Regions:
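Conserved substrate/cofactor phosphate-moiety recognition/catalytic segment
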Residues: 21-77
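Hydrophobic anchor at the beta1->P-loop junction of P-loop NTPases
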Residues: 11
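Conserved phosphate-donor/acceptor-positioning beta-strand/loop module used by diverse small-molecule
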Residues: 103-123
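Phosphate-binding P-loop
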Residues: 1-5
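Conserved glycine(s) of the Walker
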Residues: 18
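The conserved Walker
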Residues: 15
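Glycine-rich phosphate-binding loop used to anchor ATP phosphates in small-molecule kinases
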Residues: 61-104
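Small-molecule kinase domains that catalyze NTP-dependent phosphoryl transfer to phosphate-bearing small molecules
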Residues: 128-177
Length: 189
């Protein structure tokens, strides 16, 4: 990628795949601002309150809109960023394509994934231990999550750019330094 061209490093994948941990680490290492749907939504929960899954979904949609607003603000001044979310290609592709057209942004996608049982167990433990903001309503989705995780359709966005796939079944085997090296190499192209 042209070093003068801003880049969005997209960290995506299914729930409980380790996206946010990786995105936060990369943000520190690359010194790129991190725009995270869950972080934005948690700020909204703290200010507007939380009550049920429907409300959480509404704030989730608003959080995605805010992610793209913040992305545009950074791209407007030529800054590269990291975006962290379980992006859904049919909805997200047009938004990222729009940014490409408007700002000539480059993309590096990092797609985190694991097997269905591992993802479900991680999510369940996180929900039971209260590892995330209660506004997410994680306990409320446990009944449907396992069947939803059966959808193994690609999480890779249909946008120009490079894709790095990261197997996260065993977090101890995820080589963050290798991922960082790959990203830096792609940024220098």
């Amino acid at each position: 990628m042209d070093s003068t061209q801003p880049t969005i490093v997209i960290v995506t994948g299914r729930p409980a795949a380790g996206k946010s941990t990786l995105a936060k680490w990369l943000s520190q290492e690359l010194k790129f601002p991190l725009v995270s749907k869950d972080s934005i939504r948690e700020e909204l929960f703290d200010r507007l309150g939380w009550k049920d899954r429907k409300w959480a979904q509404l704030l989730g949609k608003a959080s995605i809109d805010m992610m793209f607003y913040f992305a545009q603000a950074e791209l407007e001044v030529g800054h590269s960023i990291i975006m962290d979310n379980s992006f859904y290609p049919p909805v997200s592709n047009p938004r990222f394509q729009g940014l490409k057209e408007q700002y000539n942004v480059g993309y590096i996608q990092i797609v985190c994934d694991s097997d269905r049982d591992t993802l479900f167990q991680r999510f369940k433990i996180r929900a039971e231990l209260g590892g995330r903001h209660p506004g997410h309503g994680d306990k409320d989705v446990l009944d449907t999550l396992y069947s939803n995780l059966a959808d193994t359709s690609s999480r890779v966005l249909d946008i120009d750019g490079s894709v790095i796939e990261v197997e996260t079944t065993d977090f101890a085997k995820v080589d963050y330094q290798k991922i960082l090296k790959q990203v830096k190499s792609l940024l220098e192209k």
